[in-house]
Amino acid sequence: MIGRRKQVALALTGLLAAAAACQNQVRHESAGTGRPAPSAARAFTLVASGDVLPHSSVIERAGYDADGNGYDFRPMLFGVEPVVSRADLALCHMETVYGADGDYSGYPVFKSPPQIAQGLAATGYDGCSTASDHALDDGAAGIRRTLDAMDRAGLRHAGTARTQDEARSVTMLQAGGARVAHLSYAFGTNDIPLPTGQPWAVDLIDRDRMIADARAARQAGADVVVVSVHWGTEWQDAPDRLQLTLAQQLTASKTNGRPDIDLILGTHAHVPQAYEKVNGTWVIYGLGDQIAGEMYNDKGVQDSRGNDSTLGRFTFAPPVRPGARWQVTKAEYIPQMYDLDSGRVRDLNQAISDGAELEGVRDRIREVVLSRGAADDGLVMGE
């Protein structure tokens, strides 16, 4: 596998149901470098990015970049590789499932080439959330192919499952001196019913279940609990009522005075949305689309905002005393866009010298990201 792996990943099974958390045996599975987890607590950086949504034009671009030998998504992501690969832990959102044997498609029923998992891993990503409204575009077979390909690439995943045991597991990753649990949920599956006999195939938004899962992950040894949520109103810059209400409820949940959830990462709206500190916990309502083809908004008009996004970067410091939470000591956002002409993700901080147009995109993203007062809580634009 190409790319720098930055941590040992641990899978902890049988622990998502809070009532059963103490009864199940913890199972450790290593991936990546095979190095043992660090024993001393030390600070770490976490980077997160938005929806990977390969439309037909994106698939065609990856085919072109492979020079006739399959599909290569690495050049597409090369512009953000420096930021992603330097993080101790990097998480993406894989919105689509994978096809096979050339059966690939874009909107409205997505089936992406499995080589995208290799491209994400090569860029430095350690895992992806997979619960989305397109998670059942090809039924249970699509989920199986997707997670199989991620496993082969060394890319961890959370939010969908091939088996009931997998659905009951917690995705646990090592970052610095911390064990980080990654949970993932979606608002729905575009009215596609869950596979017969597999109600656990996709994790769906349910406040009580999400809190129970977070508590179970903590009981299993998670120092930091990160929750990815596929939610929001498409093409709306502002978070909607569900986002605001759920963010309040999730961040207010505590056990023995310690918050159950340490970071919330939002996707789905297609446009960047605000960052906000809610009850002392950072919430990104919407990261935007990291990779997408031409996007048409709810009025049927091509909308360039659908190719804008941010990378969120958070520095976590060890607790000041046993039993306390890991604290975010630095919160940053990095503006980026998917350039339709070149088929490349561009870090706008690095590309800003290319002209006023890109500067305008960066400024538009900044205005939305800071629209709920995040600057007052210390959020800054990162390099």
Map each language-model feature to its residues.
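Acidic, metal/ion-coordinating pockets
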Residues: 2, 22-383
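Secretory targeting and sorting signals
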Residues: 1-27
